[in-house]
């Protein structure tokens, strides 16, 4: 039975359309809203006939419609300037709601109350200086002066108590607001990204890069609220309060002093306009660096095997270099802005001194008023100076919030159309689904390259339907459209006569289940993986699906049975497929789609699983994409798709009548037919099988736990008395174990810990040592310290100058010395501004050199680690990229901001105290006496910050990892309809992070409040002591004013140090983790060995036993394995899933160390690893194609000319596919090679292996994703190879190709011999290769 689909289009190769003209039939167009036929007519005209169908969009329009967020293309930043320029400060409040107004209002009230203490302090300080001035001019007595100073000291003590309350409140509330914004941002981004269509992600260069960028922006946004917004709001409130007091005492003097402040505002605004583009470029290049690192670490075995560590390192280094250049540009502008602003902030006292002197001379103000105005304006200057370092972080927060808003509000027309059209809430499943002239082109590919062309087919419900066709023919595209991952470019799909786009998403999700060819196993227990979102399933249902999918065969051998934690790397491919199948069978939806569901299973398991599916799914719709024709019964419906066309729809028995298909796809049947002629098979065997064959008319659920399958009797069973052996007994006999049983006690929402609880962030001493070790950095760092020393010295010098200026007002003639000291104000202001610029920029250069050195060193060391290191859960690729990319800004801050600030503050304090000692040692001694208390509390504060910050970073990594896994595996997760499960896990992780953030906010706010209030108490003590020292004539008034000014500035710098502690703690943690990675010792395997010799290819295993490093105790993946493979021999390694086959490969490629393995008689441990790997090639079952283009991926690790490349493509039959691509070999390779089918990826990996000209070729299920025709062609290539070939396979055709077969089971070599020798009922191989069947 044929379905006509315009078979007169043989020139359409791989669905590449050469458009002539098109003229649709009017009646057809009028009857259906979207019904086109693509023929040899103009595609241009066809595209002009756009249908009003809401779900159809021109291919060329989708990219702009879907991706209006910035992207990196060929190292060029697209739309960066434009995007950065349109951001506004309203974006900053995007994540706050109307209901947050009371909280925000309360936070601002507390901020104002906390800020009011500073002008009150200034007011009391003015009162103290006024009392000193009146006493110096004999206006009051000594007792009156002491009384006034003591009273004001008491006021300051009260202010200190109030500061403890207000500081705690304001600090806690700002961090609380930050936590709210971060929680909402993560929740919203998860919802938005998980709701995006597959079309959106097909146009996204990297899912991992996007997730990293989102995480980075959320961190910047959170940070900008918790610290910069807090600093800015508080200092603005302080400035406003001080201005009010200043205006209250002398409005004219205040206006004169502040006359140059508008210039500061203009300078800051002008320079900020250039900061945006620098930040955006830094963000985009960091995103690219994170993608490169994640991809490399995820495919680390491929990278190491091809000796491409240096190349991947250079790719990462180039991206980091771009990021660093943007960072330096940002730092230069920020330093220039800060230097100019600092000059104007200090120079205001130039005109203030002249005018104040004039007012004092004319008796319009008194000394106390002048001191109050100067003190208030100085507080304003100091507050604005503290705002300057916060501006860069605030700007990053602004543009990060704009990115989040842009991402969350980006219009996805595909999803919008689906939501608007989704009206159908129920389906009866009475008819079936229908494709009506459906054509489709992926939006990420060339518009003329259609994957499906004019597909029209009807499939009734309740059928088992097989979809077959060559690799890349459009089978998976067919399924993607049915799952509504994409919408048809032209045509319509109907489900039960309802347009697919009108069916509610939840209804569709509860109707269809997808099992992918490469199943996704999540970090949870086996039971949780299977029951996912089916918590109400009974235990009997769970056990039944485990039995049907044969999960119990390996799960019941574990101590914890189904509750054994697992991760993807711990399971063989077949075991992963069985878990995925059990998960799908438990859901038991009306429609089940299986994409090569048994490609990684051995023949016995494959047949048993397929038979179980047939029985369990009887009466329900099951679509199976397969290349294995032996799995299709004669009466089952088959759809044949080739080059985007539906070629045939018929029963299997009709299909095999065609010569092409008979020759191409029936090799497995031929193998089985040959078994009938084998003299070792008893003639009554088939009748015996039929006798116990299951009756499909009976309910499959009635199968008992003791169901059996045929022909698996013990090897010792007598040939004359064949018996049927219980499958449970076989499980008990075999005690099947996984090849890599390295299960971790973990869950999806687990928290990552790079440090254990006993480890701490590295000390500042260790950090300084790491700085000094970088020779290139030393001079920059020393120069930065020198300029910081100058800047730090400028503050006490300025304090000294101000004290001299204040002393002028206590003279009989205040005008004496005004010209000199006002000029000194300008000199000090200019020096301070210049030193600020040079110090900040030089330290930024130092930070760039330091961070780049250690993170590049860390990456270089990572590429030398053994596989056992990467198997550890804390070395997950996302964690490593977050440490080495996302958190690098915190490490930069260690030098560019924090060391600079701390050193400046330290310099100021030392100079201030030394100067105070020189001027009057007694008061300085009081300050020194209380400094241990300040140091102790600061130390405790720092410890609290480090511990709470590490806890918060761990939960953030955990939350981000869930987002990362969800987005990377989004199609699979949607296929299982378990997105709600991951949303719930994400919510649970957010709850944990929320609790962690609240704990951090409480304890750090308490520590900050205590430290801040101590400064008030110390100042009160200094004032109290000053009155006593003056009364005892230890000081003159002039000396006391100078010492108090210096001491006050010293306390101000101590306050600056305390304010920087949060950033210091975060930076110490980030720095510690980078330094820890950079200090790792290289692995032993990659550089091991020294022998080089003319490799022939003979392999020997001599009693090899091996257990994976993290496996259960006493569990051996290989147990006393002895085997020999001759040079140029083709040997097939066969066995059930988990028997140890892949472990042999791991040891041969020196992934793990092992003794007693020999190549050409030389011990493997003594052979030079890099030299050996160049002589070996491997084609994995799930190959990784690395490189930016197809050509780069083929030449990955080798240097060959184009002729060799084309020859390799010819041998793997990929030439035609490549030639039909718009850019040929220069076609970009998308993330996860998603622009190729699984079979095409395997063939490209095979071509890459051939280009290495190997002496030893290892094929690990290299044809599992190939159709039978492609597989047969590759087998011819393999047959003609002259090197040693090691074939791991479950395919009988590949086994027949081998000169010899080695059969493994449970890590033991059972037997070896040729195919014909092993095909008798006495052998383990016969049981393995023979069709297993369920019986009662």
Swiss-Prot record:
It is found in: Membrane. GO terms for molecular function: ABC-type oligopeptide transporter activity; ATP binding; ATP hydrolysis activity; ATPase-coupled transmembrane transporter activity. Residues 433-668, 1099-1331 form the ABC transporter domain. InterPro entries: AAA+_ATPase, ABC1_TM_dom, ABC1_TM_sf, ABC_transporter-like_ATP-bd, ABC_transporter-like_CS, P-loop_NTPase, Type_1_exporter. Residues 1-29 are annotated as: Disordered. Residues 104-396, 781-1066 form the ABC transmembrane type-1 domain. It comes from Schizosaccharomyces pombe (strain 972 / ATCC 24843). This is Mating factor M secretion protein mam1. One of its GO terms (biological process) is transmembrane transport. Its main location: membrane. It holds the Pfam family ABC_membrane. Glycans are attached at residues 437, 454, 536, 664, 697, 1011, 1063, 1120, 1235, 1280. It is a multi-pass membrane protein. GO terms for cellular component: cell division site; cell tip; cortical dynamic polarity patch; cytoplasm; membrane. Residues 1-91, 175-250, 800-897 are cytoplasmic. Keywords: ATP-binding, Glycoprotein, Membrane, Nucleotide-binding, Pheromone response, Repeat, Transmembrane, Transmembrane helix, Transport.
């Amino acid at each position: 039975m044929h379905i006509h689909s315009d078979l007169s289009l043989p020139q359409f190769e791989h669905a590449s359309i050469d458009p002539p003209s098109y003229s649709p039939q009017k009646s057809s167009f009028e009857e259906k809203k979207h019904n086109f036929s693509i023929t040899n007519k103009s595609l241009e005209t066809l595209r002009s006939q756009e249908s009003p169908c809401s779900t159809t969009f021109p291919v060329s329009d989708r990219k702009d419609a879907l991706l209006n967020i910035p992207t990196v293309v060929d190292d060029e930043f697209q739309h960066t300037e434009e995007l950065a320029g349109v951001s506004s400060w309203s974006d900053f409040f995007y994540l706050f709601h109307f209901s947050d107004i009371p909280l925000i209002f309360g936070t601002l009230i507390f901020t104002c109350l906390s800020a009011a203490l500073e002008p009150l302090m200034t007011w009391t300080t003015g009162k103290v200086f006024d009392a000193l001035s009146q006493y110096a001019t004999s206006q009051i007595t000594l007792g009156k002066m002491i009384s006034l100073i003591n009273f004001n000291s008491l006021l300051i003590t009260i202010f200190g108590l109030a500061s403890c309350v207000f500081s705690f409140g304001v600090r806690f509330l700002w961090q609380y607001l930050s936590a709210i914004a971060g929680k909402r941002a993560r929740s919203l981004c998860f919802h938005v990204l998980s709701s995006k269509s597959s079309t959106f992600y097909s146009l996204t260069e990297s899912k991992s890069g996007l997730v990293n960028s989102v995480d980075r922006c959320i961190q910047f946004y959170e940070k900008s609220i918790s610290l910069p917004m807090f600093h800015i709001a508080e200092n603005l409130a302080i400035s406003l309060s001080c201005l009010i007091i200043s205006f209250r005492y002398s409005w004219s003097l205040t206006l004169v002093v502040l006359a140059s402040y508008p210039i500061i505002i203009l300078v800051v605004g002008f320079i900020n306009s250039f900061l945006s583009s620098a930040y955006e470029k830094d963000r985009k290049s960091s995103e690219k660096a994170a993608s490169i690192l994640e991809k490399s670490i995820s495919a680390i075995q491929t990278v190491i095997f091809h000796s491409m560590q240096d190349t991947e390192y250079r790719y990462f280094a180039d991206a980091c270099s771009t990021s660093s250049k943007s960072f330096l540009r940002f730092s230069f502008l920020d330093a220039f802005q800060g230097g100019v602003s600092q000059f104007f902030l200090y120079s205001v006292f130039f005109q203030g001194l002249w005018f104040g002197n004039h007012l004092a001379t004319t008796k319009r103000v008194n000394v106390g008023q002048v001191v109050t105005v100067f003190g208030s304006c100085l507080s304003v200057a100091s507050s604005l100076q503290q705002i300057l370092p916060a501006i860069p972080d605030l700007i990053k927060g602004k543009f990060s919030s704009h990115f989040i808003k842009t991402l969350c509000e980006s219009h996805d027309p595909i999803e919008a159309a689906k939501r608007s059209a989704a009206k159908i809430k129920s389906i009866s499943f009475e008819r079936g689904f229908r494709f009506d002239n459906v054509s489709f082109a992926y939006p990420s590919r060339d518009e003329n390259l259609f994957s499906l062309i004019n597909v029209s087919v009807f499939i009734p419900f309740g059928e088992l339907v097989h979809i077959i066709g060559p690799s890349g023919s459009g089978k998976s595209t067919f399924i993607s459209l049915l799952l509504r991952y994409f919408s048809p470019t032209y045509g319509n799909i109907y489900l039960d006569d309802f347009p697919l786009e009108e069916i509610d998403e939840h209804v569709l999700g509860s109707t269809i289940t997808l099992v992918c060819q490469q199943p996704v196993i999540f970090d949870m227990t086996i039971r949780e993986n299977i029951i996912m979102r089916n918590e109400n399933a009974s235990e009997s249902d769970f056990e039944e699906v485990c039995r049907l999918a044969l999960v119990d065969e390996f799960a019941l051998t574990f101590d914890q049975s189904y509750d054994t934690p697992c991760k993807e790397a711990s399971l063989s491919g077949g075991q992963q497929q069985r878990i995925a199948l059990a998960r799908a069978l438990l859901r038991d939806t009306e429609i089940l789609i299986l994409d090569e569901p048994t490609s990684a299973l051995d023949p016995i398991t494959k047949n048993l699983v397929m038979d179980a599916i047939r029985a369990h799914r009887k009466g329900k719709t099951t679509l199976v994409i397969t290349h294995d024709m032996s799995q299709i019964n004669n009466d089952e419906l088959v759809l044949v798709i080739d080059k985007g066309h539906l070629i045939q729809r018929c029963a299997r028995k009709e299909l095999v009548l065609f010569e092409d298909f008979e020759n191409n796809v029936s090799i497995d049947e031929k193998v089985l037919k040959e078994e009938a002629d084998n003299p070792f098979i008893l003639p009554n065997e088939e009748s015996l099988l039929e006798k116990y064959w299951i009756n499909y008319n009976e309910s499959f659920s009635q199968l008992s736990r003791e169901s059996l399958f045929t022909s698996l009797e013990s090897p010792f069973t007598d040939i004359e008395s064949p018996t049927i052996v219980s499958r449970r007994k076989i499980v008990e006999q075999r005690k099947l174990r996984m090849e890599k049983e390295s299960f971790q006690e973990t869950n999806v929402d687990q928290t990552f810990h790079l440090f254990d609880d006993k480890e701490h962030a590295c000390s500042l001493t260790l950090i300084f040592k790491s700085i000094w070790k970088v020779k290139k950095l030393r001079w920059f760092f020393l120069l930065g310290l020198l300029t910081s020393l100058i800047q730090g010295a400028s503050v006490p010098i300025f304090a000294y100058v101000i004290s001299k200026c204040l002393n002028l007002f206590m003279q009989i003639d205040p005008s004496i010395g005004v010209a000199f000291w006002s000029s000194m104000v300008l000199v000090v202001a200019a020096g301070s501004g210049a030193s600020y610029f040079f110090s900040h920029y030089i330290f930024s250069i130092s930070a760039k050199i330091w961070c780049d050195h250690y993170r590049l060193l860390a990456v270089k060391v990572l590429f030398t680690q053994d596989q056992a290191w990467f198997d550890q859960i804390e070395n997950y690729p996302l964690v490593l990229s977050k440490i080495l990319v996302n958190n690098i800004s915190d490490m930069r801050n260690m030098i560019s901001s924090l060391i600079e600030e701390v050193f400046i503050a330290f310099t100021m304090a030392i100079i201030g105290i030394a100067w105070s000692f020189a001027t009057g040692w007694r008061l300085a001694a009081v300050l020194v006496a209380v400094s241990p208390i300040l140091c102790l509390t600061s130390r405790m504060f720092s410890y609290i910050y480090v511990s709470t910050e590490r806890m918060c970073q761990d939960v953030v990594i955990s939350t981000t990892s869930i987002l990362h896994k969800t987005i990377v595996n989004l199609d699979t997760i949607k296929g299982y309809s378990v997105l709600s499960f991951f949303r719930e896990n994400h919510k649970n992780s957010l709850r944990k992070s929320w609790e962690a953030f609240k704990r951090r906010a409480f304890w750090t706010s308490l520590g900050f409040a205590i430290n801040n209030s101590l400064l008030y108490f110390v100042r009160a003590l200094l004032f109290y002591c000053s009155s006593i020292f003056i009364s005892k004539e230890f000081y003159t008034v002039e000396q006391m004013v100078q010492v108090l000014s210096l001491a006050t500035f010293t306390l101000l710098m101590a306050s600056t140090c305390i304010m920087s502690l949060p950033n210091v703690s975060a930076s110490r943690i980030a720095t510690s983790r980078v330094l820890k990675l950079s200090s790792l010792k290289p692995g032993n395997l990659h550089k091991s060995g020294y022998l080089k010799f003319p490799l022939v290819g003979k392999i020997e295993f001599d009693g090899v036993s091996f257990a994976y490093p993290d496996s259960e105790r006493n569990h051996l993946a290989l147990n006393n394995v002895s085997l020999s493979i001759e040079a140029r021999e083709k040997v097939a390694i066969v066995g059930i899933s988990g028997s140890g086959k892949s472990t042999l490969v791991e040891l041969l490629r020196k992934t793990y160390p092992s003794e007693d393995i020999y190549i050409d008689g030389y011990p493997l441990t003594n052979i030079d690893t890099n030299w050996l790997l160049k002589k070996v090639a491997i084609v994995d079952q799930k190959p990784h194609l690395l490189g930016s283009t197809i050509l780069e991926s083929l030449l990955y690790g080798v240097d060959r000319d184009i002729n060799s490349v084309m020859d390799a493509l010819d041998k793997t039959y990929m030439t035609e596919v490549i030639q039909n691509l718009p850019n040929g070999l220069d076609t970009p390779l998308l993330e996860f090679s998603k622009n190729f089918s699984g079979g095409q990826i395997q063939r490209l990996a095979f071509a890459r292996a051939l280009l290495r000209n190997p002496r030893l070729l290892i094929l690990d299920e290299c044809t599992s994703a190939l159709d039978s025709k492609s597989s047969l062609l590759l087998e011819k290539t393999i047959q003609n190879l002259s090197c040693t070939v090691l074939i791991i396979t479950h395919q009988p055709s590949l086994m027949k190709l081998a000169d010899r077969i080695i059969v493994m089971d449970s890590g033991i070599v059972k037997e070896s011999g040729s195919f014909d020798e092993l095909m008798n009922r006495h052998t383990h191989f016969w049981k393995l290769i023979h069709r297993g069947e369920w019986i009662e």
